[in-house]
Amino acid sequence: MMHFKSGLELTELQNMTVPEDDNVSNDSNDFTEVENGQINSKFISDRESRRSLTNSHLEKRKCDEYIPGTTSLGMSVFNLSNAIMGSGILGLAFALANTGILLFLILLTSVTLLSIYSINLLLICSKETGCMVYEKLGEQVFGTTGKLVIFGATSLQNTGAMLSYLFIVKNELPSAIKSLMGEEETFSAWYVDGRVLVVMVTFGIILPLCLLKNLGYLGYTSGFSLSCMVFFLIVVIYKKFQIPCMNGEQNSTVSANVTDACTPKYVTFNSKTVYALPTIAFAFVCHPSVLPIYSELKDRSQKKMQMVSNISFFAMFVMYFLTAIFGYLTFYEKVQSDLLHKYQSTGDILILTVRLAVIVAVILTVPVLFFTVRSSLFELAKKTKFHLCRHVLVTIILLVIINLLVIFIPSMKDIFGVVGVTSANMLIFILPSSLYLKITNQDGDKNTQRIWAALFLALGVLFSLISIPLVIYDWACSSSNGEGH
């Protein structure tokens, strides 16, 4: 993660612009926190230790080497909220329906608090090393392996977000077109086939945007994306009081079960319960954007950035819970992994408007995430100098692969499940705790904190060991039963 999980602050836009030279210095991304004229770091690289450690020296640096933050606390909260908000919000009602209200609330609260703790670990690591970029931090602590692991986790997370956004186009655009044509949902034709439409949108709109050399104003669409999701939440709450339970589906055969079907469940276990935790984790990933936002924060300090994360996560917690609970109380066990798809827009201008707004938002957000993934690949291959043929070829190949995955993936819960138990788990649990334990392994004063970090790491490993086999088992059962999972 709608990411809209992209956290589009200035630092990211600079990083996503393709550099002109092969040997590009990344020192502009290495900020150093200074307290009383000295760097507070016990894990500083040899290269940096040879530099003068005084404020006067820092003031003499070039602007691209040390840039004081200029973003206010309020705008930083907005930026981090943008980074947190993603397509995961559409799957939370489905997660609630398969866990029950009480269990879902426990899971949502737990992931929120654990995510805040992981950001605290990340900020401590940044302060100790002087690194303000996640990949640089991994490289300094674990060498090339650390850099590759973080690049891989971040790229997988962004790819998962792109898949979920294009899946929304595949699901929602046919309904929107049918509504605009005045046709019923049962209407079928090649031009309202989601698979055809997602390919047309990808190569007609997204491909030209992805071929641009830099993002330009496209990078500022995250504000629009967040606004769309706030609008979606308002509509979900409003529609709860308009749509009757079972949505007119009850008849003489099922009337006896209507009361039970329209009664909220507080604790539920079934084969789909396994997707709840990965979906929630997917919805809260913002860690690649935390350090860039930190670097832009005015008068930055660890305490101030922690306040930014606390406010942002609390706001998203409220928004996520309201969306999940009202979506669930509208459709109960009939809710789908894409909540928006359950609403019928035929003859309903409000639903049609929110559907079109979300479609436009995700279409504009995909290129932003694509720039990040492609830039990461070029940097790993040390091919940072712009080359038109390579630029076009890599773009087309990646978009073809992504489209094939979108066409053949049965439902959004599969995206949430896979990305949630892999990259989201790595970015929230495993990487921050591993970095912290490595950095503080010589610090005897932090034994208590190290124990908590070790438990946090163990929790992430346990999450993977339990969730991955269960997701695979559900796929196997669904396939053997001839069901789409």
From Swiss-Prot:
<keyword id="KW-1003">Cell membrane</keyword>
<dbReference type="GO" id="GO:1903803">
    <property type="term" value="P:L-glutamine import across plasma membrane"/>
</dbReference>
<feature type="topological domain" description="Extracellular">
    <location>
        <begin position="413"/>
        <end position="414"/>
    </location>
</feature>
<keyword id="KW-0325">Glycoprotein</keyword>
<feature type="topological domain" description="Extracellular">
    <location>
        <begin position="332"/>
        <end position="348"/>
    </location>
</feature>
<feature type="transmembrane region" description="Helical">
    <location>
        <begin position="311"/>
        <end position="331"/>
    </location>
</feature>
<keyword id="KW-0029">Amino-acid transport</keyword>
<feature type="glycosylation site" description="N-linked (GlcNAc...) asparagine">
    <location>
        <position position="257"/>
    </location>
</feature>
<dbReference type="GO" id="GO:0006868">
    <property type="term" value="P:glutamine transport"/>
</dbReference>
<feature type="transmembrane region" description="Helical">
    <location>
        <begin position="113"/>
        <end position="133"/>
    </location>
</feature>
<feature type="transmembrane region" description="Helical">
    <location>
        <begin position="415"/>
        <end position="435"/>
    </location>
</feature>
<dbReference type="GO" id="GO:0016323">
    <property type="term" value="C:basolateral plasma membrane"/>
</dbReference>
<dbReference type="GO" id="GO:0022853">
    <property type="term" value="F:active monoatomic ion transmembrane transporter activity"/>
</dbReference>
<feature type="topological domain" description="Extracellular">
    <location>
        <begin position="98"/>
        <end position="112"/>
    </location>
</feature>
<feature type="topological domain" description="Extracellular">
    <location>
        <begin position="238"/>
        <end position="273"/>
    </location>
</feature>
<feature type="topological domain" description="Cytoplasmic">
    <location>
        <begin position="370"/>
        <end position="391"/>
    </location>
</feature>
<feature type="transmembrane region" description="Helical">
    <location>
        <begin position="349"/>
        <end position="369"/>
    </location>
</feature>
<dbReference type="InterPro" id="IPR013057">
    <property type="entry name" value="AA_transpt_TM"/>
</dbReference>
<feature type="transmembrane region" description="Helical">
    <location>
        <begin position="274"/>
        <end position="294"/>
    </location>
</feature>
<dbReference type="GO" id="GO:0015375">
    <property type="term" value="F:glycine:sodium symporter activity"/>
</dbReference>
<feature type="modified residue" description="Phosphoserine">
    <location>
        <position position="56"/>
    </location>
</feature>
<feature type="transmembrane region" description="Helical">
    <location>
        <begin position="217"/>
        <end position="237"/>
    </location>
</feature>
<dbReference type="GO" id="GO:0005886">
    <property type="term" value="C:plasma membrane"/>
</dbReference>
<dbReference type="GO" id="GO:0016020">
    <property type="term" value="C:membrane"/>
</dbReference>
<dbReference type="GO" id="GO:0098591">
    <property type="term" value="C:external side of apical plasma membrane"/>
</dbReference>
<dbReference type="GO" id="GO:0005295">
    <property type="term" value="F:neutral L-amino acid:sodium symporter activity"/>
</dbReference>
<feature type="disulfide bond">
    <location>
        <begin position="245"/>
        <end position="262"/>
    </location>
</feature>
<keyword id="KW-0769">Symport</keyword>
<feature type="modified residue" description="Phosphoserine">
    <location>
        <position position="28"/>
    </location>
</feature>
<dbReference type="GO" id="GO:0030424">
    <property type="term" value="C:axon"/>
</dbReference>
<keyword id="KW-1133">Transmembrane helix</keyword>
<keyword id="KW-0739">Sodium transport</keyword>
<dbReference type="GO" id="GO:0005283">
    <property type="term" value="F:amino acid:sodium symporter activity"/>
</dbReference>
<dbReference type="GO" id="GO:0009449">
    <property type="term" value="P:gamma-aminobutyric acid biosynthetic process"/>
</dbReference>
<dbReference type="GO" id="GO:0015186">
    <property type="term" value="F:L-glutamine transmembrane transporter activity"/>
</dbReference>
<keyword id="KW-0813">Transport</keyword>
<keyword id="KW-0406">Ion transport</keyword>
<feature type="modified residue" description="Phosphothreonine">
    <location>
        <position position="54"/>
    </location>
</feature>
<dbReference type="GO" id="GO:1902475">
    <property type="term" value="P:L-alpha-amino acid transmembrane transport"/>
</dbReference>
<keyword id="KW-0915">Sodium</keyword>
<keyword id="KW-0597">Phosphoprotein</keyword>
<dbReference type="GO" id="GO:0015655">
    <property type="term" value="F:alanine:sodium symporter activity"/>
</dbReference>
